[in-house]
């Protein structure tokens, strides 16, 4: 009876993912195969001058792959999934729920169109949650009057949009996504009302897009809000004063929608920028938001989302609160992380951007180890913990406190005070960015901040509801994909090589399993060198007559074949289980290689350069838009090149090298030495088959997205140079 009572009290349940017995059997046999491969390499080293250097290089690469494989198993051993009971939350707390401050970050009105940003803003304003308890803050690091204008338009449209969402309980509550998904369908409301709201939205979007195209705001619009007076002709995105404007004051009697319900508070912030001070990128913006929001609303829960990551599930706040307010476990939980999902994925995931295996397999495994990663968007934090509070068994959060009382200050006075919290000099000689708030000094400020929270004793929870909580825009070109993964791999590798290395910083603070889990991503960049070696040297060995694998009829070929086949089949199983298609998995294998020889390689090089003081940290925004032709090719699942990027030269060189070497290898097999070189021919052939779209882009396609002739010529030159390598 006691157990039943306890179970009834719980606001969430934790369930183990099934199929572990089969997985562990597979892992054990693969581990045995890997040990046999390493033993073979160690005991069959050729004499000097007989391909010894190439053999030792292969052994080193395989040793690295073995170590990395062991690390990746840490998140597959015992994954869990979470289930919440929102009905119990409603029964227990009714309207006595904590306030929530929502942070949305943008930086460039051209890379991140304001019309996209405000759809995200409107979606988080429309949560199935008391509006008076929601405060939404937009950080505009570009300090653009265009973004402010778009937010002002959104504040007007919200008066009609929020009642519409509540009245018909629609999903999603991003107007752009809703009208795109429900085109021509309006079963929940009358066609007249549906068309009316849709027309209002489209007219607003056209006004915003027109202003962005012209770069100007109509003078009559500027007269409608005092905030437009903050801008002058001398301001730039890198040099401007702090701006804080409250567009909707949730405490004002006038802040109501068309149904008379209270509107959420809506605030625009552009922190001060000056060439004399480092602004610390997104981390600096988030810390400024923490301070400004503490003055205006000071809610105990903070949600941060990227500007393109709209709310797709209006119950996400309530799901997160099931963890924060659970009587038995809430005192341990520092943040609740939702997965990243995208609404612009092609059917077969042409660029491997779906993150399905990471979302459905790896993050669940990290959750079981005591903490999934903080990934910088779709994450609910407890304010005090984000601000540096250490874990204590006796600590109890005061969830009952409401939105901060204002006293006798009017909104203009609040705005002026808030500006002083968003200056360049406020953080000087303070612990902001170190012990307080989001951490500085790393391109992936989110991961290192989450690691610090875990090392202070807090756990985190990974919540994957049936309806995706947040949906965003994935890179739609190869260049954007490479850039995004270069930034991720560089940032995580920077952490690995810093004092925050999880094995050092996390020793005695977090479990070994979680330390290894962090290293899966921390070592992405380090995977580049052994991968490049493995996709080039065996191919060159075919041309130069250097065998690098056991003969195909030898018993020692068995562990090589077994490890390769079982690992490949299990990766296919994970991909299909996570929602990928067979072709999507195959595309993922291609992108696995492409990212390792480009994104991860550049991330590795740039990290080493920074450590040597040869370069400084930078942050490049992944564009959220692409032109019409690029978008069409993306929908047709055609790889996008189109420029003479050095990364494309690497891709073309590897593809062309393996093609030429395969032809040479086949001639050797026809000459009667198939038993010796067949393993290398098979490896080379698989790389060639994987790269068929690359050959098409080099020699067949005529569209603007093909590989340019200079890239093809450069790759031919590098292939010729590769044949001069003495290593084999």
From Swiss-Prot:
The chain crosses the membrane at residues 21-43, 53-73, 523-543, 546-566, 646-666, 669-689, 707-727. The active site is at 141, 446. Its EC number is 2.4.1.-. The keyword DNA repair does not apply. This is Cellulose synthase-like protein E6. Thought to be a Golgi-localized beta-glycan synthase that polymerize the backbones of noncellulosic polysaccharides (hemicelluloses) of plant cell wall. Keywords: Cell wall biogenesis/degradation, Glycosyltransferase, Golgi apparatus, Membrane, Transferase, Transmembrane, Transmembrane helix. It comes from Oryza sativa subsp. japonica (Rice). Belongs to the glycosyltransferase 2 family. Plant cellulose synthase-like E subfamily. GO terms for molecular function: cellulose synthase (UDP-forming) activity; cellulose synthase activity. GO terms for biological process: cell wall organization; cellulose biosynthetic process; plant-type primary cell wall biogenesis. It comes from the Eukaryota. It holds the Pfam family Cellulose_synt. One of its GO terms (cellular component) is Golgi membrane. Its main location: Golgi. It is found in: Golgi apparatus membrane.
